[in-house]
Amino acid sequence: MSSQPLTAANIFAVLRHLRSLCHPTRPVTTASFASSIASQITPSRAYNNYTPTHYTPLSIPKNSALKQWHFVASYSTVPPAKTEKETTEDTSLSKSTKPKPKKPLPAWAVQKNALKEKFKEGWKPRKKVSPDTMESIRKLHSMDSVKFSTKNLAEEFKISPEAIRRILKSKWRATEAEEIDRRNRWEKRKIRIQEQMMELGLRHTDPTSKDDPSAEEVLSQRHYSSNAIEDLSGEYPPQNRRREGIPQKRIVPEDNSSRKFDPWEVTADDLLGTKRDSFRDNWSKEDSPKARSSSSQRHPRRIEYNERSYKEKPDW
């Protein structure tokens, strides 16, 4: 190739010369190619003082181009060696994943876990227990702690053993005012349950309406008069409104003299030493009509329900 500047017109000639180097069948000298390229490179205008002798010619070894073009990439399956930083990170992660030693549980937690294993039902009873029943539980357990144990009392009263344990452990006792208030609330709860049973149809509905107060007054006066006659004669007067042809049921008092003592039927009122400070528990025989009349004025609906329960039978 003639010594001409490397321009766009001479690019094809240079590419053709490079292609000939890739094929070994064509004998091409690398020295002539290097000298031709060095001769075609011209310095820029800023370096006009420099002569072409300052440029070092390209020294390409023999068959270097062939080795570059026929190079086969080789991949290694061996993982690279870890650096010191990576090894320290791995050791820190392995130390953090180790389980920490468990701290000893406090005494209250140990007791709580033991109670959970022993009483699986928990302490919450399946039903509410009246104050009289709780007092009976305490008395029975004090009489014979082996026979009336926690398990036996729980099976008899249908509550959880944990509730029995807490009742026996409790040392709180209600005062006189608190006892009266508790009994009043318990009576209200009993009446509320009876009314709910009436609404569900499990009991006879009350014929008297709640909006008519005169009916309640009539019922209370009727009950008061029947109590007064009972106190004088000793028995109830015959009822004139009985249906004809239906024999009257005669009530015979039960003889309990030959009956054996059953400790499960003992209530707090039958036990000695039971404190009864409520005015409703200390009624005497002389004051019973007065007390019943006062209760009839307070709860006429309950009195009417009790009267109807003796006269009629449910349609179950």
From Swiss-Prot:
Residues 1-27 form a transit peptide. Keywords: Mitochondrion, Transit peptide. Pfam families: Neugrin. GO terms for cellular component: mitochondrion; nucleus. It is found in: Mitochondrion. Residues 201-213, 241-263, 272-290, 302-316 have a biased composition (Basic and acidic residues). Residues 80-105, 197-316 are annotated as: Disordered. Required for respiratory activity and maintenance and expression of the mitochondrial genome. Belongs to the RRG9 family. PANTHER family: NEUGRIN. This is Required for respiratory growth protein 9, mitochondrial. The gene is RRG9.
